[in-house]
Structure formats: C-alpha cells, structure tokens
Amino acid sequence: MKKNWTKILTITLEIIIIIIASFLVIRNVCYTAIIVNQSSMNPTLNDGDYGYAIKTKHALNNIKRFDIVIFELEENNEKKDLIKRIIGLPNEEIEFKDDSDLYVNNVLIEQDFIDKETQKLTNIGLKQKKFIVPENQYFVLGDNRGISYDSRNFGYIEQNSIFGILKIITKHYSNYNNETNKYEKEEFISFKFF
C-alpha cells in the first residue's frame, strides 16, 4: 500500500514538473513580459502597467493597424525599447489635417482609443504633415499625442525592429505616500486583452 502512494506521488510530481516546465518554455519562447514605464500611451496604458507581448514569427509577420507593438529604437548610438500603436502599414499614405484629423489613404480614421484632449498635435514641432510609409516599415504613434515621441519625430520603424505585439495588460494602480516615500497599497484591478 505504501508503494502505491509513493508511485502516485511520484507520478503526480512528474506531471506537475512537466506542466510547469511547459508553461515556462511557452512563456519564454512565445511571449515576453513588459512593464510600462512611459506615459506616451495614456490612457490605454499607464506607467506601472504589466503585460505580455506575443513574439512568435507568425504574429510579427501579421501586424495590423492599431496593434500595440514593442520595438527597439536606435538613436545616437543608444538603443531603447518603446511601446506605440501601429497607424500606418507599408505603402500607405498618412496625413494629418486640421492639426488633429488622421487620414490613411485619404480616409478619415476614427480613433476611439485616444483621449480627445490629447488628440491635438499642436506644440510638438510637427514639421511634416504627410507621410508615405516605405516597404517593410511602419508608422507608429503614441495614444497620448501631445507628448508622445513617435514616428512624427523619429520616422518609420523597420519591421525587424519590432519584437512583440501587446496582447494582455494588467491595469496597475497604487497609492504613493509622499511623506513616507512608499507605496501604501497596490492593486491589480483589471485585465485588458488586445
């Protein structure tokens, strides 16, 4: 009888180890964890939000308009990771009219995901209002248009610089006490799927 329990326990532990190992392999091969540390994607993403981005070759070869992507930007011999929304696909014409209306191939694009207050493009030094996206490149914008550093500033991003498409985000809220310099309460309120 004792041998049976030992055998059952051994098999159960082996199954648990296989499940955990499979989960870790899938997570590391297919997904990358992210922490948002910028406000250029407000109100969709906030500083401190956690998420997972898919990084499979199939997903990265099927990028669609409005996908939120994580990519590497190299400027002045420095590399940094940014999170932005895909607006223009290869070979499309992007145009800003009246400082806030966004047109793709002469069609007005509805942007329900941005705050109307941040939609205005004034005071950001926009030198160019019309863009033609080259082959294998994308035009990206932050949802917080008034402060976002994006394709309006650094130009198009190469397809091969994109290493993830955001799929899950956990909205993170915390109360910071300025007197104690500590977070008093942290809550993970909701999940958002893209």
Feature map (PLM): residue ranges:
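Alpha-helical transmembrane segments and their juxtamembrane interfaces
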Residues: 24, 37-38, 153
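Short N-terminal signal/transit or membrane-insertion segments
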Residues: 25-29, 34, 76
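Hydrophobic membrane-insertion alpha-helices, especially the h-region
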Residues: 10-29
